């Protein structure tokens, strides 16, 4: 499955940029309280609505960091399942669809184990010094599970848009997500890793 990922935070950054949908601009939300840096380009899949009312998050494995606002056509290869203080907070893992260097990456088990551990460790600790923030990491899921999650989030986005909910996310607000959100999509984990926690 190919998707468009809008990058908010380039690889190697501590600044946490977010798309301000109302203003149509990139806003600096905060600098990470810890000394960690994003291990890959980070953004979201367009026209999706996750359980937390935001677009579905995505990581893009890429050799050179891009820039906030860059749109990348990506191939989905897996997903990291996790939760934060607001609930489900899954991260879809992607690679640029037309990069021959990434041609061998087709599913989560194609990503080296140590690289997956680096990504997992980042999400276990990146909010550790922020008051009131909680993270619980769960496991890696395969490409099929990631694609099922994307389809569920696209359906949720379409349903919320049909309800005529205006707002910041392409006509969909976080409040609309509460009405449109359903149960967590299923999906078998592949190459699962141990759970961790941060607060």
Identify the function of each model-found stretch:
Residues 1-187, 191-192, 196-199:
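Hydrophobic N-terminal alpha-helices or hydrophobic patches in metabolic proteins across all domains
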